[in-house]
Amino acid sequence: MDNIEAIRRLERAYGDQDYGTVDEILAEDFVAHTPGSEMMPPGREGAKAADMGSHVSFPDKKTVIEDLFGEGDLTVSHVRMTGTNKGGLAWAGIPANDRPINVDWIQISRHGPDGRIHETWAQMDTPTLMMQLGAMPGM
């Protein structure tokens, strides 16, 4: 499996909540360099916990890879997530409010020679997310 296909497969696995496939794609020593990752368990268990939480908050969550490219051991993806806040965001103190979201994030992943993802750096457009959820005034 090449690096581009690994990212596509990972997004499908998260969407399907297929955490066995997530374990196949993320290395055992996986490290997430993302805001809030310190609140999660380390490694791929933390990545799976974050995804599970997003499905609780947004049970109708859909993600689309808008852009994806790679060179060497790195891939860069631009992902768009849509959904409806049915479960709230406990980490932000936001209750369920049925507001729709449409938010982007950028992710850089480092792939190992074993074909697995070993590190990810990701940044979501959190200000837009907070505005869409009514937790921050619009600009």
Locate predicted features:
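C-terminal and inter-domain tail/linker signature
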Residues: 1-139
